[in-house]
Design a protein with these regions (language model features):
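Juxtamembrane intracellular "pre-TM" segments in multi-pass secondary transporters
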Residues: 1-24
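Pair of pore-lining "gating" transmembrane helices in MFS-fold secondary transporters
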Residues: 16-36, 117-118
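Short amphipathic helix-loop junctions that connect adjacent transmembrane helices
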Residues: 39-54
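Small-residue hotspots at the loop-to-helix junctions and early N-terminal turns
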Residues: 53-61, 146-147
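Helix-to-loop junctions at the C-terminal end of transmembrane segments
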Residues: 70-83
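C-terminal transmembrane helical hairpin of 12-TM major facilitator-type secondary transporters
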Residues: 84-130
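A late C-terminal transmembrane helix in Major Facilitator Superfamily
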Residues: 121, 133-170, 178-179
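Multi-pass alpha-helical transporter architecture, strongest
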Residues: 177-200
Length: 200
């Protein structure tokens, strides 16, 4: 029992770090657009666009290629950009892509796939920088820091999937709305946090 209470105490200690808490919220929000796509993509491609399972798998693989490409490009090229500019662009592009999906996403499968690419690419590209920022906020309790981020990100992702289960007129609207709201929220919180120097 003592060990459990001590663990909870360490979680409370970590969450009292304002910089960590702000970054935790920002980068957990970025999980939501990805999880909204994962939970709805089969319904969008197969039910809305009437594609076969095989054709759906091609579109899904196309999207997955950008998820793999983004971290590679970050390590080789994108990390040389100023962090403030890079992350602001990432969050902003997710928001813009979300708004375009909201308006044009239901047109056809190719339009939806292309409009979702920035969400996948920039959502994945910002993750290495986010991991570094989050881990740098604490000199101790690295296990708690990493575990808490994984847990909160999972909760945000679950919330996204739950929101997608609501009665949307078209499921592309769910993906677009969540991407727009998450990206916009990240831009606002990020710029406020930077201006107030909330983190290291």
């Amino acid at each position: 029992a003592g060990s459990a209470f001590q663990s909870l105490g360490r979680i409370g200690f970590v969450l009292r770090n304002r910089g960590y808490l702000v970054l935790l919220v920002i980068f957990s929000l970025m999980v939501m657009p990805v999880m909204s796509f994962l939970s709805t993509s089969s319904f969008i491609y197969m039910n809305l666009f009437n594609l076969s399972a095989e054709k759906y798998s091609y579109f899904f693989a196309f999207n997955g290629c950008f998820a793999m490409l983004a971290p590679i490009l970050y390590m080789r090229v994108l990390r040389k950009l100023p962090r403030l500019l890079f992350l602001t662009v990432c969050f902003g592009c997710v928001a813009v892509s979300g708004s375009l999906i909201l308006i044009f996403g239901a047109a056809n499968p190719f339009v939806f796939a292309l409009l979702y690419v920035p969400v996948t690419f920039f959502g994945s590209a910002c993750r290495p920088a986010g991991t570094m920022l989050i881990m740098n906020q604490m000199d101790t309790d690295n296990g708690t820091v990493g575990s808490l981020w994984g847990c909160v990100a999972l909760l945000f992702g679950s919330l996204s999937m739950m929101l997608c289960s609501l009665n949307w007129p078209v499921l592309t609207m769910a993906v677009g709305t969540i991407s727009l709201c998450a990206g916009t929220s990240c831009v606002i919180i990020w710029l406020v946090a930077v201006s107030r120097k909330m983190f290291k």
